[in-house]
From Swiss-Prot:
Protein name: Glutamate-1-semialdehyde 2,1-aminomutase
Name of the gene this protein is made from: hemL
Reactions accelerated catalytically: (S)-4-amino-5-oxopentanoate = 5-aminolevulinate
GO annotation (BP), single: protoporphyrinogen IX biosynthetic process
Entry GO CC: cytoplasm
Pathway: Porphyrin-containing compound metabolism; protoporphyrin-IX biosynthesis; 5-aminolevulinate from L-glutamyl-tRNA(Glu): step 2/2
Cofactor: pyridoxal 5'-phosphate
Family: Belongs to the class-III pyridoxal-phosphate-dependent aminotransferase family. HemL subfamily.
A single GO molecular function term of this UniProt record: glutamate-1-semialdehyde 2,1-aminomutase activity
Modified residues (N6-(pyridoxal phosphate)lysine): K265
C-alpha cells in the first residue's frame, strides 16, 4: 500500500470522506487522492515522493508558484512578532491600501477569512442597503457554501451531482433567483418577475467553478446596465480572478464598475483570507459605523496579510500577465493540435493563467453546455496525465491555473504529457 493510500485510509476514519473539501476526494474522476508533503515552484511532492507539475495551484492562490522565497520571508518576519493579536495591525492597513490602489471600484475594504465569508457578507450588505431580500445568481457559478448560494452551484457541489445542497431551507432557496450565464434575456425576465425585490446580482465575471467560461462580448456591460436600471447592487465575485487575470481583476479588463467586489485566494499568498469592498456609501453601512453586522476573530490576520502583501507587491513589480497568457496559449494550442490529429472534439477556453479542457464538440458558454461535456472521458484523461506527472483539477468542472513558475521545462513537459494523454484516449 502506498503512503498516500495508507494516509487516506486513516483519514476516512476521522474526516467525512477522508477530506476537508469534497473535490479533493477524487469522486468525479475516480480513484483515491494523493497526499502532498511539500511543494516548490510548479511542482508538488507527494507522500510517496512522486513529483507532479501542478496546474491546480492550491485552487488559484499560487500565482507565483509554491514556496516563493519572498512570501516565505514575509511570513517569517511577521511570525517573529506573533501569530494573531485580536486588534488592528499595521499589515491590514497596508493590504487595504494595495487593494484600493489596484481596484478603482473599491474605496473601502473589509478583510475576512475566506471567499465564502466575503460573498456572504457582501450579499448581507446589499440587502441592508436596498432593504430587499432576493438575490440573483447564475447557474453553475459558485460563490462559497453559504445557504443562499448553494442553489445550482458550481465547484464541488456540481462535481458531486448535488447542485442543490441538503440542509438549505426552502425559504432560503426561494430568495435566490437563478438565471443562465451569458443570457441577457433571462436576466431581464428575472428582474421583470421580481420587480422591486432584487437586492443584488452576484456573478463570477469569468466563470471558474463550472470549468472556465468567458462572457459573450458586451454581456457584463448588459448586466451592469440592468442592475443600474433596477436599483440592484452588482457584486463581482473576483475571489478567483482578482489579481489573477489582471492586477485590477476582470473589471479592469472589461472596463466594468461593480458596486461591490469580493476577493480572496491570491491576496492571502496561500494563507486563509477573504475581502470585500466597494464605494464608501455602501461600506460605511457596516458595523461599527452602520447597521449591517459583520465580524471575524481572525480577520486581518497578520500572517495572512504579510503573505498577501508580498504576493501583491511581486505582481506589481513583475507584471507577469502577458507572460502567463502566453503560457496558457502554449498549453491550449498543444491540446487542440493533439485533439485535431486524434479527431477528438475538445474545447479549451483559456484567458491569461486560467483554462479548462472540455470533451465536447460545442463551445462552452454556460452551465448546460459545460454539463454536455464527457466527464467520464475527462476522468480517463486526468488519470493518464497524473500517471505521467501532470496534475490537473480532479473534476471536469473546475478551472486549471498556471503560475509564473511554469515557464521553461515545466510547460514544455506538460504540453507533451497532455498531448500524449489526448492521443491515448
Amino acid at each position: 500500500m502506498s503512503v498516500s493510500d495508507s494516509l487516506f485510509e486513516r483519514a476516512k476514519q476521522l474526516m467525512p470522506g477522508g477530506v476537508n473539501s469534497p473535490v479533493r476526494a477524487f469522486r468525479s474522476v475516480g480513484g483515491a487522492p494523493f497526499f502532498v508533503k511539500a511543494a516548490r515552484g510548479a511542482t508538488l511532492v507527494t507522500a510517496d515522493d512522486q513529483e507532479l507539475i501542478d496546474f491546480v495551484c492550491t485552487w488559484g492562490p499560487a500565482i507565483h508558484g509554491h514556496n516563493h522565497p519572498r512570501i516565505k520571508a514575509a511570513i517569517a518576519e511577521a511570525l517573529e512578532h506573533g501569530t494573531s493579536f485580536g486588534t488592528p495591525n499595521p499589515y491590514e492597513v497596508e493590504m487595504a491600501e494595495l487593494i484600493v490602489r489596484f481596484f478603482p471600484s473599491i474605496q473601502k475594504v473589509r478583510m475576512c477569512n475566506s471567499g465564502t465569508e466575503a460573498t456572504m457578507s457582501a450579499i448581507r450588505l446589499a440587502r441592508g442597503f436596498t432593504k430587499r431580500s432576493k438575490i440573483i445568481k447564475f447557474a453553475g457559478c459558485y460563490h462559497g457554501h453559504s445557504d443562499s448560494l448553494l442553489i445550482k452551484a458550481g465547484s464541488g457541489a456540481l462535481t458531486h451531482g448535488h447542485p442543490d445542497s441538503a440542509g438549505v431551507p426552502i425559504s432560503f432557496a426561494q430568495e435566490t433567483v437563478v438565471v443562465t450565464y451569458n443570457d441577457r434575456a433571462a436576466l431581464e425576465a428575472a428582474f421583470a418577475a421580481n420587480v422591486g425585490q432584487i437586492a443584488c446580482v452576484i456573478i463570477e465575471p469569468y466563470c471558474g467553478n463550472v470549468g472556465f467560461i468567458m462572457p459573450d462580448a458586451g454581456y457584463l456591460q448588459a448586466v451592469r446596465e440592468l442592475c443600474t436600471r433596477e436599483g440592484a447592487v452588482l457584486i463581482f465575485d473576483e475571489v478567483m480572478t482578482g489579481f489573477r487575470q489582471a492586477r485590477g481583476g476582470v473589471q479592469e479588463l472589461e472596463n466594468i464598475t461593480p458596486d461591490l467586489t469580493c476577493l480572496g485566494k491570491i491576496i492571502g499568498g496561500g494563507l486563509p483570507v477573504g475581502a470585500f469592498g466597494g464605494r464608501t456609501y455602501l461600506m460605511d453601512l457596516l458595523a461599527p459605523l452602520g447597521p449591517v453586522y459583520q465580524a471575524g476573530t481572525l480577520s486581518g490576520n497578520p500572517l495572512a496579510m504579510a503573505a498577501g502583501i508580498a504576493a501583491l507587491k511581486l505582481l506589481d513589480e513583475e507584471n507577469p500577465y502577458a507572460r502567463l497568457d502566453q503560457l496558457g496559449r502554449q498549453l491550449r494550442d498543444a491540446v487542440l493540435a493533439a485533439a485535431k490529429t486524434k479527431g477528438l472534439p475538445v474545447q479549451v477556453p483559456q484567458r491569461g493563467s486560467m483554462f479548462s479542457i472540455f470533451f465536447t464538440p460545442q463551445p462552452v458558454r454556460d452551465y448546460a453546455s459545460a454539463l454536455a461535456g464527457d466527464a467520464k472521458l475527462f476522468g480517463r484523461f486526468f488519470h493518464t496525465c497524473l500517471a505521467n506527472g501532470v496534475y490537473l483539477a480532479p473534476s471536469a468542472y473546475e478551472a486549471a491555473f498556471l503560475s509564473t513558475a511554469h515557464e521553461g521545462a515545466a510547460i514544455d513537459r506538460a504540453c507533451e504529457v497532455l498531448a500524449s494523454a489526448i492521443n491515448e484516449l
